[in-house]
From Swiss-Prot:
The lineage of its organism: Bacteria, Pseudomonadati, Pseudomonadota, Alphaproteobacteria, Sphingomonadales. SUPFAM superfamilies: Ribosomal protein L20. One of its GO terms (molecular function) is rRNA binding. GO terms for biological process: ribosomal large subunit assembly; translation. This is Large ribosomal subunit protein bL20. NCBIfam families: rplT_bact. Keywords: Ribonucleoprotein, Ribosomal protein, RNA-binding, rRNA-binding. CDD domains: Ribosomal_L20. Belongs to the bacterial ribosomal protein bL20 family.
């Protein structure tokens, strides 16, 4: 029975790690030990930031809606409350898009939300 060494699998594993580390600076791109740590950390950042991306976009949409709504004399929270009372079922992404690109249509949505608010 012949002896089996693991040179081929080790080389393949190392190659896979170094391919993932392509474009990194310094020893991170060509030293397997450092590259492995860098690739693992990059994966952790990627996982975390896929979650953060969702929060960031929601915050951006809220800022855009708030800016458009304040020009019409409402606050963001008043507008959202009025929209809920009026039965407007647009999500924040769609409302932000309307506010940016279709100002007249968004102003009509604001008017509906204003009308649904109780007079204070």
């Amino acid at each position: 029975m012949s002896r089996i060494k693991r040179g081929v699998t080790t080389r393949a594993k190392h190659k896979r790690i170094l391919d993932q580390a392509k474009g990194y600076r310094g020893r991170r791109k060509n030293t397997i030990r450092v590259a492995r740590q860098a690739v693992e950390k990059a994966g952790q950042y990627a996982y975390r930031d896929r979650k953060v991306k969702k929060r960031s976009f929601r915050a951006l949409w809220i800022q855009r809606i708030n800016a458009a709504v304040r020009a019409e004399g409402l606050t963001y929270s008043q507008f959202i409350h009025g929209a809920k009372l009026a039965g407007i079922e647009l999500d924040r992404k769609a409302m932000a898009d309307l506010a940016m690109n279709e100002g007249a249509i968004f102003n009509a949505v604001i008017a509906q939300a204003k009308a649904a608010l109780p007079a204070a």
